[in-house]
Amino acid sequence: QLHPELKDDQSLQSLTQYCTEIDHFGEIHWPEADHVRYEFMLHELIRGLEFQDPHSDEQQLHFGFTCLDSVYASLTLRHKAQELLEQEGRPFELPEPKALAIETSNDDTLKLAQKQGYELVVRKDPKLGSIRIKLRPDTQFDLKPVADLIHQHDTEGTWYYHPSGKMFLNGSSKHRDQRPSPLTLAEVVEIIKQAYAK
């Protein structure tokens, strides 16, 4: 073994499994295997680059390695998000929708939880104090009742209600002048429960 310290690296294992699957033409078993969306995947992009410039092996290698490094970084964030959801995620009861709350700085937990079936996810960043509440786009609900109630309880934080009705966001990494909410995660969960009580 060249690097025994990488034996338990989940991200590297995921990357290796994916590359092996592609090498064995395993994508024929994917759902809607002939769908155009798969042309946007890494192995097809490398093939497209080869078609564009068939004589530049160095350019293809550089592009491929840059993409693989990026995928490895994304996988590391995803595996960490999965671990956090399992250890720190707190499902809470609503008549509808299925909901989960989590306190973490890892923003990947939001999307991953939604992909796992949670329709509403609320995340509070313990470092920044910001809060993000999101609904899956395919839900029949919107966050207007939640937004209205939060505005009654929080007059300090800067909140943004997305026109889709599926996102209600406090704080922003792009706009540093926005104020975090003083509400705790537990308080936000209680407000959400009140908003959707039947």
Region spans (language model):
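Gly/His-enriched, cation/cofactor- and phosphate-binding structural elements
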Residues: 74-198
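Internal, conserved structured core segments that host functional sites
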Residues: 2-90
